A protein has these predicted regions:
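Short, solvent-exposed helix-loop connector elements
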Residues: 159-171
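C-terminal folded domains that constitute the principal catalytic or ligand-binding module
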Residues: 174-176
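Gly/Thr-rich phosphate-binding beta-strand-loop-beta motif of the actin/hexokinase/Hsp70
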Residues: 1, 179
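Glycine-rich anion-binding loop/nest that anchors nucleotide
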Residues: 32, 161-162, 178
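Mg2+-dependent endonuclease catalytic cores in nucleic-acid-processing enzymes, primarily RNase H-like
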Residues: 2-158
């Protein structure tokens, strides 16, 4: 059995980014206060949970599970709230017990992909704009390819219309869109 080598990489990465302060445009210093780590990736789920339990940044890192919520699916707003659950706009943090016993976030991937794409469409400088830093397109080419690896399809079901995101057949990878 081959040992998974990325935990050392994720430890270095979280150490570099979560262990420092960042200066905003107005000069104020801020820290990253929440970092979600994809726990839906095959056999690495248990490794992600273990890392989140044992990390020096255990109060900041949290496993996450993206869920496809299509038009015919039950939307997050209709889930029955249980004691200890935390509920947000198209995300929830279920109360946990058992083997993994680590708080984790479950979120509606279709909603959040639409959210990111809507922000990228806002004009530069306007309220709600999401932009890439700098003017050297090559620095952002891979990110742009991942962000455009899927397309939205408006779908109706259960009396509502939602965007459902589908992979473009000619594109191979969408990992960075999934992790935004």
């Amino acid at each position: 059995m081959r040992r998974c080598r990325w935990p050392a990489g994720i430890e270095r990465l979280t150490g570099q980014y979560l262990g420092r302060e960042w200066r905003r445009d107005d000069g104020a210093l801020v820290r990253i206060d929440r970092c979600l780590i994809d726990a839906n990736w095959g056999t690495s789920t248990d490794v992600v949970y273990q890392f989140c339990r044992q990390s020096a940044h255990a109060g900041v890192v949290m496993p996450s599970h993206g869920r496809f919520v299509g038009a015919s699916s039950q939307p997050f707003s209709e889930y029955r709230r249980r004691q200890g659950d935390r509920i947000g706009h198209n995300w929830r943090m279920p109360n946990v017990h058992g083997k993994r016993a680590v708080r984790h976030v479950v979120f509606d991937t279709n909603f959040w992909k639409s959210f990111v794409h809507a922000r990228l469409a806002v004009a530069m400088g306007d309220r709600g704009c999401l932009s890439l830093f700098g003017d050297q397109a090559e620095q952002h080419r891979l990110l742009a390819e991942h962000l455009t690896a899927e397309y939205r399809v408006k779908t109706e079901g259960r009396g509502r219309t939602v965007d459902e995101w589908k992979m473009r057949p000619e594109r191979g990878e969408n990992h960075w869109l999934d992790c935004l």
